C-alpha cells in the first residue's frame, strides 16, 4: 500500500517539464510500434510461457487494463526468466528474459527515452545507439592513433550488467527524466526479480541482459564515465561495457589506468577486472584486442586488422560447417557457410586482410571439394562424375579407384579442374575473396 500511495503522490506532483512522458510512453501508437519491434526481434517466452504470437490477442483485449494499472501505480512487472549462455572463455553469460508483455512495455519506454538521451550521450559512445556501430568505434581508435594516441588503457568490467547500482542509476535518471512516474516504473523493472529453478530471487542490483530497456540503462549509467573523461580531455571510446582510453605515452596511460579504475569503483560502484585491465600499445597484436580487431602500421601508415583470436574462431567455425559429417548434402552446407561468412565479412570488412582471406578462401575451396568427393562415395560414381565434368576416362578411372585419403585426393589437379571455382560458385559457394573486395572497397 505504501508503494501505491507513493506512486499516486508522484502522479499528482510530477515535474511540469515532462508532465506527460508516461502518457507518451503508453500512447497507443507508441505501444503498437513497441510490439512490432519485439515481434521483429523474436525471442523466447518469459516465465508465463506466452509467445509473441499469443501476446497480440492478449494485448488487444487487455492493453487498456494494463495501462490503467500503470497509471494507478498497481502494475508489477513479472520476474525475468534466467538463461545461461556459454562464453568462449568457458564461463557463462547470464540473461534475464522478461515476459513478452514486459518486453513490449520496456520497448515503449525505450522509444521515448532514446530521443532524450541521444542528445546527452558522449561522441565516443558507440554501443546500442542508432546509426552507430562497432566499425565506427574501431575507425575512431584508428583516427586517434594517427594523431599520436598510440597507448591504450583497456578496461574490463566484471559482470557489468549484473552489478549496476540501482540507487546511483535512479539518481542519474532523475537528472533528465522529469516525470517521476517513469522513473518509478523503471525502478520496478529493476527490482522485478529473477526466477531461477522455480524460485524468485530478489534483484538488489543489476539490469539483466535480455530486456529491451537494459542496453539503454547501461549506456545511461556509463555516460557518467564518458562525460567525466570528456571533461578531462581524454579520448574515450566505448562500446557498451568495452572501454578504451587513449594516451600519447606509456606513463600517461598508466596514470589513466589508475584514475579510471578509481572512478569506476568508487563513484559508480563497479568492479574492474584488474587481471584483464591493462595499458598497452595499440600495435601490440597479442595484447591489444578491441571488439575483435587489432591495429598495425607499415610504410603507408596505420591500418585495421583482424585480431588473431578472431581469425582462429572464424576458421574453426568454417571447419565445423564444412566437416565431412555435415556435408552429407552439399547445398545446405554451402548455404550455412554463406550466411555465416557474409555476416562475418560485413563486420570485419573494414580490416586489411587480403592475403589472409585468399589463404582461407583456398583452404575452404579445398574442404568443399573434399566434401563433394566424399559425397560421391563409390568409385563408379566418382568415375562417372569426373568424366561428366571433362576428365579423360583413363585418368578419371585412376583417381576414382585411388585409396588415398579424401583430403589428399581433393587436392589432385584433375579434381581441382573438375570442381573449379566457377562450377562451385554456380553451385552456391560463397567466394570469400570476391565478397571481401566488395565490402572493403568502402574503406
Feature-to-residue mapping (PLM):
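Charged, compositionally biased N-terminal leader segments and the immediate start
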Residues: 1-29
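Core structural elements
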Residues: 26-31, 79-81, 88, 328-348
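Short, charged alpha-helical motifs in flexible N/C-terminal segments and linkers
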Residues: 39, 43-51
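Amphipathic alpha-helical blocks
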Residues: 54-77
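Conserved polymerase palm-domain catalytic core
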Residues: 69-84, 88, 120-282, 287
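A conserved non-catalytic segment of reverse transcriptases
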Residues: 191, 267-335, 340-342
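Short, solvent-exposed helix-loop connector elements
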Residues: 202-205, 303, 319-332, 344-356, ...
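Extended C-terminal regions of large enzymes
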Residues: 367, 376-443
